[in-house]
C-alpha cells in the first residue's frame, strides 16, 4: 500500500464526505412543499449514514498514521427543493469519484484489501442514495 497516497486520497474523500453530511442535513431540515415532506426524513437518514462513513474515513486516516483534514468541500444551499436535489446529485457524483479514486493506492496486502472493501461498501451505499435522489427528482 502506498500509505502517503492512500492518506491523501482518503482526506480528499473526507472533504467531500463532510460536505455530504451537512448538505443532507440542510435539505432534511429546510425542504418545503407537501410533495417534498416525504423526502425530509429520508434525507435525515442519509445525513446520519454520511456521518458514519465520515467517521470511518477519519479512523482509517488516523490508523494509517495520517491526520484527518479539517477542510470542507464548498458547501451550497438553496431553498428550492428541486434545485437542492440537483445539487446533491452533482455533489454526490464528485464524492463517489473521490471514493473510487481512493481504491487505487490500496495495494494487495490484507490491510489494504480491508480498506478497499470498506470503500466499496461506502460507494455502494452512496450510490443507492443517489439512485433515491434520481427517483425523487423524476417524481417532482
Question: What is the role of each PLM region?
Answer:
Residues 1-140:
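Iron-associated oxidoreductase/ferritin-like identity signal
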Amino acid at each position: 500500500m502506498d500509505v502517503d497516497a492512500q492518506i491523501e486520497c482518503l482526506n480528499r474523500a473526507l472533504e467531500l464526505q463532510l460536505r455530504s453530511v451537512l448538505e443532507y442535513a440542510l435539505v432534511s431540515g429546510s425542504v418545503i412543499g407537501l410533495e417534498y415532506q416525504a423526502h425530509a426524513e429520508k434525507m435525515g437518514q442519509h445525513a446520519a449514514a454520511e456521518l458514519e462513513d465520515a467517521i470511518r474515513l477519519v479512523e482509517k486516516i488516523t490508523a494509517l498514521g495520517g491526520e484527518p483534514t479539517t477542510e470542507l468541500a464548498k458547501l451550497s444551499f438553496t431553498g428550492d427543493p428541486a434545485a437542492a436535489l440537483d445539487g446533491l446529485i452533482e455533489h454526490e457524483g464528485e464524492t463517489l469519484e473521490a471514493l473510487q479514486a481512493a481504491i487505487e493506492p490500496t495495494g494487495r496486502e490484507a490491510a489494504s484489501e480491508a480498506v478497499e472493501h470498506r470503500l466499496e461498501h461506502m460507494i455502494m451505499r452512496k450510490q443507492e442514495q443517489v439512485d433515491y435522489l434520481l427517483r425523487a427528482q423524476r417524481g417532482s
